[in-house]
């Protein structure tokens, strides 16, 4: 569904030197008219989406996390940008990443872009690349980025001291089996339930369902200190998710969980936006957790039905007290009153939102239209989000 109408652009990307492109779960019909029938007949299949995010360099290093490739994820959009998180790994995790990539690349879910009916035009692709380079030279939003090749020696010098020792492994949905979206939820719950003292979760889209509530209840009864940060309606880019998250707020808090929601005007916007860009608000896109100050999860998986049963997802589980300490500091900063609302219950068990400046008794929002959309999307089955 995400590549509707993009055949010419995809064909021209494929035509560029040294680039090979494959599409996950593509349309079988290339004609727009025929796709209407395909959508009716195969909507369940077409709704399956590859949500994994992975970069591998020379088979030796990998970057993975929640970040897509787009302006919103790199602080370059004038409307809003995302606070997101990745991890750079060298060693065994990079080897795992190579294996995962090969499984996807060779799976029956992928098709080569060469199968597109639009014929690639190498000259048109080259001209488009030249135009893009010329546009980028003058693009206001790219002022902070070098146009010409740069020596990155100083950046590499800062990188090495920031690396943390640890052991880890990759977890991901098994596309080789022909089934997707069936394994990661159990993996995530097992990670959470290993916590004995403290569990910090930052996740952009949360719809816990009864299984998630049961897990939080069990952890709470064991005395685990649980803190969860997710989006507020005001910081949300997908109000439909908020529509199906909000009925769970009270029950989440009643398990003893400390619940926080991102402020749309969070102070961390200053490190999210890349000057001179200044978005109108900041949203949360991170998917991460720290258990007992030692174990770390960073990946692509949201805690909602779509990630649990429809998307393919992935992540890294890492045993590293030093990395966990770094990430814990970041997560607690993001949960502070300057960056988030703490959602609590008052004496009458009514919800209230408190930040560093004020307490309010209705969920923060950016405007009346958000409130309308929040109501409208309640009629859409939560399993789609």
PLM ranges: what are they?
Residues 1-53, 57-385:
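Charged, low-complexity intrinsically disordered terminal segments
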């Amino acid at each position: 569904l995400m590549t509707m109408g993009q055949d010419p652009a995809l064909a021209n990307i494929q035509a560029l030197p040294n680039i090979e492109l494959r599409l996950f779960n593509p349309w079988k019909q290339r004609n727009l008219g025929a796709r209407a029938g395909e959508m009716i007949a195969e909507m369940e299949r077409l709704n399956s989406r590859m949500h994994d995010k992975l970069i591998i360099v020379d088979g030796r290093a990998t970057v993975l996390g929640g970040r897509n490739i787009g302006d919103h994820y790199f602080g370059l959009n004038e409307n809003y940008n995302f606070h997101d998180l990745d991890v750079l790994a060298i060693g065994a995790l990079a080897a795992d990443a190579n294996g995962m990539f090969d499984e996807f690349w060779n799976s029956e879910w992928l098709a080569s872009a060469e199968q597109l009916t639009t014929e690639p035009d190498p000259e048109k692709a080259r001209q488009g690349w030249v135009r893009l380079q010329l546009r980028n030279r003058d693009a206001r939003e790219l002022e902070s980025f070098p146009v010409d090749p740069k020596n990155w020696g100083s950046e590499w010098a800062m990188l090495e001291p920031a690396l943390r020792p640890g052991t880890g492994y990759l977890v991901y949905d098994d596309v080789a089996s022909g089934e997707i979206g069936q394994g990661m939820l159990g993996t995530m719950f097992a990670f959470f339930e290993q916590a004995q003292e403290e569990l910090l979760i930052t996740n952009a889209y949360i719809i816990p369902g009864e299984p998630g509530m049961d897990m939080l209840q069990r952890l709470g009864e064991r005395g685990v200190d649980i803190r969860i940060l997710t989006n507020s309606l005001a910081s949300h880019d997908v109000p439909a998710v908020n529509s199906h998250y909000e009925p769970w707020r009270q029950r989440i808090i009643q398990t003893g969980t400390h619940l926080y929601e991102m402020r749309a005007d969070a102070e961390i916007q200053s490190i999210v936006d890349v000057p001179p860009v200044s978005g109108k608000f900041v949203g949360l896109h991170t998917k991460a957790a720290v258990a007992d100050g030692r174990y770390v999860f960073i990946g692509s998986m949201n805690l909602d039905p779509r990630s649990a049963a429809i998307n393919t997802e992935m992540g890294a589980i890492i045993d590293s007290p030093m990395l966990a300490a770094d990430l814990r500091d970041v997560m607690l900063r993001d949960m502070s009153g300057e960056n988030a609302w703490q959602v609590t219950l008052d004496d009458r068990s009514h919800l209230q939102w408190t930040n560093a400046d004020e307490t309010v008794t209705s969920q923060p929002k950016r405007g009346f239209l958000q409130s309308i959309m929040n109501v409208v999307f309640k009629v859409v089955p939560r399993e789609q989000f």
